[in-house]
């Protein structure tokens, strides 16, 4: 029952206005007493709280105010950072339900926005690479890759490397490095002297001796082939210069014609015994071809 009905007294003959005024005064007095009692009780509760709990409550309120006023960043906050903040504020979450609800909302937003969805600008755009990633020391430069069939040959001549530019003419390269023939001849002479020395041969085994002989043979054949190419180049140069003396337009020989010119020059400058050997070799070769064309060779 309300306070108004409790204070009603039976058999009162006073005026209604006076009763109403007294009633209002009594209500206001009771209300002021109640407020004073509540203030005293709240002060007593604050006195019983420790400084640590008051400090935690103050930090929570400051964080809430800072997050309300903080501008929204485009970059989302990672979930690991939020988990660390949970560990720090475990006590405050247990005490207040409001704080727990606040952190739950933040975690939901982070899980929603935490995953970065890659977006492609254009299909014709160049490849993007992070500047934070270290560049490897060994890189595949486009245009300089070694094909698979030539990867076994690791040691290549730098004169024919693609990085130096276009491939030059072999005649120009030969002129530049023709002085190396002297070193090759000296090396061949030294190797021949070693193979003729009996003391040196007694110190090495049979395998090393065969290897040295094979190397000497290959060096001689390589040097001879270089000299033969130089001779053929000079022959063709003289022939073309004689042919184009009185011509306004320069005429160049085909490969088949070049081969015939070189063979003719060599045959003319051979000795009699060498010519006989060459003619005998060609005759045997021709007879062998004719013999293979007989009918009994085609039987199965």
Curated annotation (Swiss-Prot):
Tell me, how does this one assemble? Answer: Associates with 90S and pre-40S pre-ribosomal particles. Interacts with CKA1, CKA2, CKB1, CKB2, PWP2, UTP15, UTP17 and UTP22.
Q: Name one Pfam family in it.
A: RRP36
Task: Give the source's domain of life in one word.
Answer: Eukaryota
Coiled-coil parts of chain: 203-232
The encoding gene is: RRP36
Similarity comment: family membership? Belongs to the RRP36 family.
* Any single biological process term in GO: maturation of SSU-rRNA from tricistronic rRNA transcript (SSU-rRNA, 5.8S rRNA, LSU-rRNA)
What are the boundaries of the region Disordered? 60-146
Q: GO terms for CC?
A: 90S preribosome; nucleolus
For the modification Phosphoserine, which residues carry it?
Answer: 14, 41-42
Q: Does the keyword Glycosyltransferase apply?
A: no
Subcellular localization is given as: Nucleus, Nucleolus
Chief location of this protein within or outside the cell: nucleus
InterPro entries for the chain = RRP36
- Keywords from the named record: Coiled coil, Nucleus, Phosphoprotein, Ribonucleoprotein, Ribosome biogenesis, rRNA processing
Protein name (database record): rRNA biogenesis protein RRP36
For bias type Acidic residues, the affected ranges are: 85-109
